[in-house]
Amino acid sequence: MDRKELLSRPVRDLSITADTRLGDLMDQFSSIGGFTAAKIHEAYEIIKDMFSEDNTTFLSFPADIISTGLRGLINEVVKRKLVDVIITTSGTLDHDIARTYRNYYCGSFSYSDIELRDLGINRLGNVLVPDESYGEIIEEKVMESLEKLYAKKKEWATVDLIHEVGLDINSESSIIYNAAKNNIPVFVPGITDGSFGSQLWSFYEQHHDFKINLLEDEHRLSDIIFDAKKTGAIMIGGGISKHHTIWWNQFRDGLDYAVYVTTAQEYDGSLSGAKLEEAISWKKVRPDARYVNVYGDATVIMPVLLAPFL
């Protein structure tokens, strides 16, 4: 360790007013010291290079944030073509479709779930989802699309199916519509785990020659991975979305850039709690990669982190 180098960046006080822009605040975060703010700045710098270089950028996230207003931020990122590939869950399709046509409502974590059940209201954290805003509307819209797609051909890669359903939605408020419009592939490795997947099963029960080709999705992902000069990933939360992102990147010796936003901890034993450092041992992140783990609530961190790019 070099003493002079270690003492080269003094901690500086924040200087902010009501007119301070987020980009300026982000620059000040570089010398704030402390905890999350410094990590957010590091993530910002990594994402800035990720977006500016000849890099294939993955965006992975779970479904729950799409039930919140963060859907609008993700949608704007997709509209602006800031990312090249999305990897997410079946629930993302559910919430994106449902919220295109129906409202979800602000509530509380402390409401009685027994009473909510009796009222026909589902609780997702502090978001309230009435029965009529979820299953019924998803079934109606997905089944309409499946009938049309089945008439075209009997076997579909999931990524193509999502593309076509997105085009059918034809609403600027929809993530999968804008992804389809901008030719950003949306991969859902756990497609049957959700209402969208249940509609696929239900349709299959009536049309046994209807097939979903998941291996074609993996073939498409392999082409993306092996054609990429560099890869980077913005990963919000963990689970299958995060793992499928880093899993495929091991076949090119790992991600060159990685930003992981999470509240999970290593001691819970989950993939969500695993730091990016652990992924280096699996060759899912390169040893010389630029990466950072940012701990905190994505609904707070992501708007601050991404707003300067919008």
From Swiss-Prot:
Entries under InterPro entries matching the protein: Deoxyhypus_synthase_arc, Deoxyhypusine_synthase, Deoxyhypusine_synthase_sf, DHS-like_NAD/FAD-binding_dom
Assigned EC number: 2.5.1.46
Example of a GO MF term: deoxyhypusine synthase activity
Known pathway: Protein modification; eIF5A hypusination
Active site (catalytic residues): 284
Enzyme class: transferase
Alphabetical list of Gene3D superfamilies matching this protein: Deoxyhypusine synthase
Record keyword Transferase present: yes
GO CC list: cytoplasm
Cofactor: NAD(+)
Source superkingdom: Archaea
UniProt catalytic activity: [eIF5A protein]-L-lysine + spermidine = [eIF5A protein]-deoxyhypusine + propane-1,3-diamine
Signal peptide: none
This protein's UniProt keywords: Hypusine biosynthesis, NAD, Transferase
Coiled-coil region(s): none
Protein family (similarity comment): Belongs to the deoxyhypusine synthase family.
Main function: Catalyzes the NAD-dependent oxidative cleavage of spermidine and the subsequent transfer of the butylamine moiety of spermidine to the epsilon-amino group of a specific lysine residue of the eIF-5A precursor protein to form the intermediate deoxyhypusine residue.
Name the UniProt record assigns to this protein: Probable deoxyhypusine synthase
Organism: Thermoplasma acidophilum (strain ATCC 25905 / DSM 1728 / JCM 9062 / NBRC 15155 / AMRC-C165)
Source organism phylogeny: Archaea, Methanobacteriati, Thermoplasmatota, Thermoplasmata, Thermoplasmatales
Gene field: dys
